[in-house]
C-alpha cells in the first residue's frame, strides 16, 4: 500500500505541474479568448479518475481475471510430485525474496511460459503453463519461477499499473485540450462542441495512445531485465541463462492474453518493431545476465 500511496502522490504532483505549466504557457488564456469555457481543474480531475480508475480496477481484479482468462487451476493440495515440487520451490523463493507465499497455479498451454500477477507483494499469483513443465528441466523451471517471484518482490504489477494510469491520464487530458484548441481556434465553433472537437480528440487520443504504449513497453522491458537479475540471485545465473536458451530453442507464439503477457517469461515477437515489445529480445537478456 505504501508503494501505491507514494506513486499516486507523485503522479498527482505531475498532473498539478502539468496544469501549472499549461497556465504559464498561456494555453488557458488562449482558450478563454476563443470562448471555450474550458475548466482545466475539472478536466484534470476527470482525466485522472478515468485514467487511474481503470488501471487500478484492472490491477485489483488481476488475479481473478488471469485465472479465468487462462483457465489456471490453483494448487490447493499437490496431487503429484511435480505439483509438490512446484509449490515448495515457490515457497522457498518467496521466503528468500521477502514476500508472502503466492498462490501457485498451472494452466493448459503448449508454449513455455509463466506469469505473475496480483494487487500486492503478499497476495499474488504465480502460474506456469503445462508446456513449461513438460519441456523444461527442473533447473530451468526453477529459474523461471524465480523470475516470476522477482516480479512480485519488485512490485512490478503495481508499478506498471500506475505508469499505465499516468499515461492514460495524460492521453485523455491532452487529447481534449487539443480538441478544444482545434475546434475553437481553427473551426471557430462558438458554442458547445462541434464535430471538429470530437474528431480531433479521437485522432489525438489514438496518436497519443500509441506514444503512451511505447512508454509503457519501455518500462516493461526494463522490469524484465530486473526480474532476470532477481532470478539469477534466487536460483543462480547459469540456471536463468539456461532457461532463456531453452526459450530460444522452443519458441512458440505466446498464448497468454495481452493483459498479462507483460509478466510472462516469454515475450511475443513484434512485427512492428522493438518499441512495442513488452520483453527485450532473448539474446539481449542473456547478454545482460552474462555481463552482470
From Swiss-Prot:
| Binding residues annotated for Zn(2+), in chain numbering | 147, 151, 224
Query: Which EC numbers characterise this protein's activity in its record?
Result: 3.4.24.-
The annotation note on the cofactor reads: Binds 1 zinc ion per subunit.
Active site per database record: 148
Q: GO annotations under biological process?
A: proteolysis
Grouped into one coarse class, the protein's main location is membrane
Pfam families with a match to the protein in the record: Peptidase_M48 (PF01435)
A GO CC term attached to the entry: plasma membrane
Task: Specify the protein's topology with respect to the membrane.
Answer: Multi-pass membrane protein
- CDD domains in UniProt: M48B_HtpX_like (cd07335)
Q: Which residues cross the membrane?
A: 4-24, 42-62, 158-178, 198-218
Record InterPro entries? HtpX_protease, Pept_M48_protease_HtpX, Peptidase_M48
* Localization: Cell inner membrane
Give a GO molecular function annotation for the protein.
metalloendopeptidase activity
Look at the named UniProt entry and state the broad enzyme category this protein falls under.
Answer: hydrolase
> Which superkingdom?
Bacteria
Cofactor list: Zn(2+)
**Keyword annotations from UniProtKB, A to Z:** Cell inner membrane, Cell membrane, Hydrolase, Membrane, Metal-binding, Metalloprotease, Protease, Transmembrane, Transmembrane helix, Zinc
Q: Which family does it belong to?
A: Belongs to the peptidase M48B family.
Name the HAMAP family on file: Pept_M48_protease_HtpX (MF_00188)
- The name of this protein is Protease HtpX homolog
Tell me the organism: Nitrosomonas eutropha (strain DSM 101675 / C91 / Nm57)
